Curated annotation (Swiss-Prot):
Origin species: Theobroma cacao (Cacao)
Pfam families: Methyltransf_7 (PF03492)
E.C. no: 2.1.1.141
Entry's Gene Ontology BP terms: methylation; oxylipin biosynthetic process
Protein's pathway: Lipid metabolism; oxylipin biosynthesis
Protein name: Probable jasmonic acid carboxyl methyltransferase 1
Site-annotated residues for Involved in substrate discrimination: 150, 222
One GO CC term, this protein: cytoplasm
Binding site for jasmonate: 25, 156-157
Binding site for Mg(2+): 174, 260, 262-263
Length: 373
């Protein structure tokens, strides 16, 4: 799978779009807001800037995209006013992979600029927004051009499927699974860990060149508390997806060989793994490294023990995952809309049954970093 060409959130504003099904990601941004505010405040306190470079890496599309940069601008403006500093010009860079729905973002900019002018008094001559297509596992910006980097719900995606997993052997390495599971052999766990150890330092090293001395970076991604990569909080959504896919295999709707050759380019690290890679690279001070839980549906359904509650939470969790992974499933399995609908209907039922018994939650890590001088 060519991840950089295939991976994108569902486009547009339809029923299955990311724009309509990104409540979990929005909640993650909201919970992490105090940490973002702290970082932005320190930049504004320590510098009187004429122009401020801000990048959102893995911006996707939909309401979360412009909401994030709007809130960062609010923070800078409020701190500047308190200190009696002039509000800097804003250079805002929205980055994602080439197949991201940048058109939707650009179409929403006129209304966004209008709100900036009406609500904040910031005109188009003081705010410059650019789309930057490319992988953040490499350089994206000129040296020392950024003051703040934000990335939320993106760094758990790997640059590629770990090498060696797509085996042509008689018995596939991760048979019947789409990610790490309790039954995965150690070689699968090791391959995913190695890919993270390759990708994450490339991200950190690239940002170290692009950020000014004292620049700040706040990263948020799915992770896990335990050092064990097979824990439910990091794996079970994929385990249940594999169950739904295998039910289609048993009915002859999907080829089993296709399942055995599909491996999700995702990795949920523990805090220690992140800490080790940051310290090894050496360009950043870790100011904060924290974690928190979040419901699979973003906490929208409170009572999951009734038939209606079980149905609703399953449907919401299924729509949230579909908005994120449909592009990869469509590319790999080559299935049409009817089978895709069937797959996520089955997944919704499986998830509803599971969450009515055990309220498994995602675990999210937030890291706040300062570029060393």
């Amino acid at each position: 799978m060519e991840v950089m060409q295939v991976l994108h959130m569902n486009r547009g504003n339809g029923e299955n779009s990311y724009a309509k099904n990104s409540t979990v990601q929005s909640k993650i941004i909201s919970i992490g807001k105090p940490i973002i505010e702290e970082a932005v405040h320190e930049i504004s306190c320590n510098n009187v800037l004429e122009s401020m470079g801000i990048a959102d890496l893995g911006c996707s599309s939909g309401p979360n995209t412009l909401c994030v940069i709007s809130e960062i601008m609010d923070m800078v403006q409020a701190t500047s006013h308190r200190l009696g500093h002039p509000v800097p010009e804003f250079r805002l860079y929205l980055n994602d992979l080439y197949s991201n729905d940048f058109n939707s973002i650009f179409m929403s900019l006129p209304a966004f600029y209008h709100r900036l002018k009406e609500e904040k008094g910031i005109g188009c001559g003081s705010c410059f927004i650019s789309g930057v297509a490319g992988s953040f596992y490499g350089r994206l910006f000129p040296s020392k051009s950024l003051h703040y980097v934000h990335s939320s719900s993106s760094l758990h995606w790997l640059s590629q499927v770990p090498p060696g997993l797509e085996s042509n052997a008689v018995t596939p390495l991760n048979k019947g699974k789409v990610y790490i599971s309790k039954s995965s052999p150690h070689s699968v766990l090791h391959a995913y860990s190695l890919q993270f150890q390759n990708d994450f330092p490339m991200f950190i090293e690239s940002r170290s060149q692009e950020l000014v001395s004292g620049g700040r970076m706040v990263l948020s991604l799915f992770g896990r508390r335990s050092t064990d990569p097979t824990t439910e909080e990091s794996c079970y959504q994929w385990e249940l997806l594999a169950q739904a896919i295998m039910s289609l295999v048993r009915e002859g709707l999907i080829e089993e060989e296709k399942v055995d050759s599909f491996n999700t380019p995702f990795y949920a690290p523990c805090a220690e793994e992140i800490k080790v890679e940051i310290q090894k690279e050496g360009s950043f001070i870790i100011d904060r490294l924290e974690g928190f839980e979040i419901d699979w549906d973003g906490g929208a359904v409170s009572d999951v023990h009734t038939a209606q509650g079980k149905l609703l939470i399953g449907q919401r969790a299924a729509k949230a995952l579909r908005a994120v992974v449909e592009s990869m499933l469509e590319s790999h399995f080559g299935i049409g809309q009817d089978i895709m609908d069937d797959l996520f209907s089955r997944y919704a039922e499986i998830v509803g049954n599971h969450l009515s018994k055990t309220r498994t939650k995602y675990f999210n890590l937030v890291i706040s970093l300062t570029r060393k001088g």
